[in-house]
């Protein structure tokens, strides 16, 4: 189950009320910073931009590939551990606007996690240390430490123990 805070709205849908939930100038600033970071090939610069201007928590030696799209409204709710790779064109959401409510949730990505290209991570999930997320996955629930997951809907392909056994066999 994803951990999100629910905020009901009345009248028009929640996205119609967007600037009552997040300041307009914050969105403009975040948009500009994210667009610069999406296209720059300099990983150190991306991490600096994310930490400095978006207030994201980004661990040492973490790499964001080209075109990664962190949440534009609430990037400060995203935390990425050390020595993690976020694959090309991955989207990390910390919010979702629905018809009668909007939801906000932290996204916690552990240490030494590998996230494949074109993955979408929904708000309120935790991806455990050492996990591997296959390309094109919709991460809609927590991922256990060391697990290999993939698909839409996401499912566990190998547990941490099964992954260790596979690595052991391939080394023989």
UniProtKB/Swiss-Prot annotation:
Keywords: Acyltransferase, Repeat, Transferase
Family matches, as Pfam families: Hexapep
UniProt KW tRNA processing keyword: no
Enzyme category, top tier: transferase
Keyword match Repeat: yes
Documented EC number(s): 2.3.1.-
One Gene Ontology molecular-function label: acyltransferase activity
Transmembrane segments: none
InterPro entries reported in the protein's UniProt record: Hexapep, Trans_hexapeptide_repeat, Trimer_LpxA-like_sf
Family named by the database record: Belongs to the transferase hexapeptide repeat family.
Name of protein: Putative acetyltransferase YvoF
Name of the gene this protein is made from: yvoF
């Amino acid at each position: 189950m994803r951990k999100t805070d629910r905020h009901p709205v009345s009248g028009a849908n929640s996205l119609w009320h967007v600037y009552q939930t997040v300041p307009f100038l914050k969105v403009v600033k975040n948009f500009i910073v994210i667009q610069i970071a999406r296209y720059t090939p300099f990983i150190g610069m991306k991490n600096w931009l994310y930490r400095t201007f978006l207030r994201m928590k980004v661990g040492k030696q973490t790499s964001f590939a080209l075109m990664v799209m962190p949440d534009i409204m609430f990037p400060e709710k995203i935390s990425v551990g050390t020595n993690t790779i976020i694959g090309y064109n991955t989207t990390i959401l910390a919010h979702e606007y629905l018809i009668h409510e909007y939801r906000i949730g932290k996204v916690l990505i552990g240490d030494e996690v590998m996230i494949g290209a074109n993955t979408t991570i929904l708000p309120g999930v935790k991806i455990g240390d050492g996990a591997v997320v296959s390309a094109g996955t919709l991460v809609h629930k927590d991922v256990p430490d060391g697990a290999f997951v993939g698909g839409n809907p996401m499912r566990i392909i190998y547990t941490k123990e099964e992954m260790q056994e596979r690595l052991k066999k391939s080394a023989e």
